[in-house]
Amino acid sequence: MARFHFDCVFYYVRDIEKAISFYSEVLSLRLTSRDVVARFDIDGVLFELIPTRDEGKLRGDGNARLCLKVDDIDDTVQYLKTKGTHADEIQKVENGKLTSFEDPDGNEVYLWQYD
């Protein structure tokens, strides 16, 4: 029987330099390596940015989303505003609070604060 192991989460991006800047400077993610692909480590999970010119891959309308856990969603949303990033209205859900925003390529990123 085949065995599967988690490898990574990735987003296609139009401008790799702009995307690296957004994820490293705005979201404070640590860039761990860079060749054609930019790689970040998020609590032991590999997150990659892959440059492409294929507009079909840049639609950002797939089902996969990056979801980042935060301690204080209200403070985080205020911080994002200072960086020019607008988050949607914070929603109260059964086990916490949730909001989302888009990266420079229209990929949706979620913020989650657990109760």
Predicted regions and their residues:
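Vicinal oxygen chelate
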Residues: 1-2, 81-115
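N-terminal beta-strand motif that seeds the catalytic metal site of vicinal oxygen chelate
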Residues: 1-18, 46, 64-66
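Aromatic-flanked redox-active Cys/Sec active sites in thiol-based oxidoreductases
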Residues: 13, 42, 70
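Conserved active-site tyrosine of GNAT-family acetyltransferases
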Residues: 19-24, 80, 106
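Short secondary-structure junctions
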Residues: 28-34, 86-90
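Conserved short beta-strand elements that form part of the metal-binding/catalytic scaffold
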Residues: 30-62, 108-114
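Short beta-strand micro-motifs in enzyme catalytic cores
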Residues: 38, 64, 97-99
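Mid-chain, well-packed structural core segment of small domains
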Residues: 66-78, 84, 91
